[in-house]
């Protein structure tokens, strides 16, 4: 696992319907579980991916979050995908500052871009020193929340990549 790409998924089917993901975040099916004791001092975890609007209808907004374990790494500000070519991309880098353990200190930063009919909005996130239980498995996951339950609206976790170096 250490030394490069640990996980890569490209999915044509990992969709989240607005009718199922309104008012609360719902996890996409694609996840990656980092094995216990993988993140040690000076290990770098890189997470990247994209969410694509598969079907759009009306003015429903979409908010996306990326997690490591139970910690939110970044939140993509809600945007209104108005065409099936609209998307969001994200990347986040976590650096372990301590040996694997129950409270291994990590720091991180990353960014995101949304594209809504060609209009791009960018954002950034910084994670202050945060302790993770790296002596156990840590799950990388992505969730989304729609603003309403419009039946013909959905988004798909198009790609999810995890690198550990």
PLM feature segments, named:
Residues 2-165:
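Surface-exposed molecular-recognition determinants
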């Amino acid at each position: 696992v250490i030394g490069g790409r640990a996980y890569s998924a490209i999915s044509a089917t990992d969709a989240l319907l607005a009718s199922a993901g309104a008012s609360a975040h719902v996890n996409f099916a694609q996840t990656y579980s980092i094995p216990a004791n993988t993140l040690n001092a000076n290990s770098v975890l890189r997470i990247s991916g994209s969410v694509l609007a598969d079907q759009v209808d009306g003015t429903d907004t979409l908010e996306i979050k990326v997690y490591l374990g139970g910690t939110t790494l970044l939140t993509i500000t809600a945007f209104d995908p108005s065409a099936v070519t609209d998307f969001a991309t994200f990347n986040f880098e976590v650096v372990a500052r301590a040996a694997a353990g129950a409270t291994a200190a990590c720091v991180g930063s990353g960014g995101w871009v949304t594209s809504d009919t060609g209009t791009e909005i960018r954002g950034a996130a910084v994670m202050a020193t945060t302790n993770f239980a790296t002596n156990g498995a840590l799950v990388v996951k992505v969730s989304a929340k729609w603003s309403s339950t419009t039946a013909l609206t959905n988004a798909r976790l198009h790609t999810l990549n995890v690198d550990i170096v």
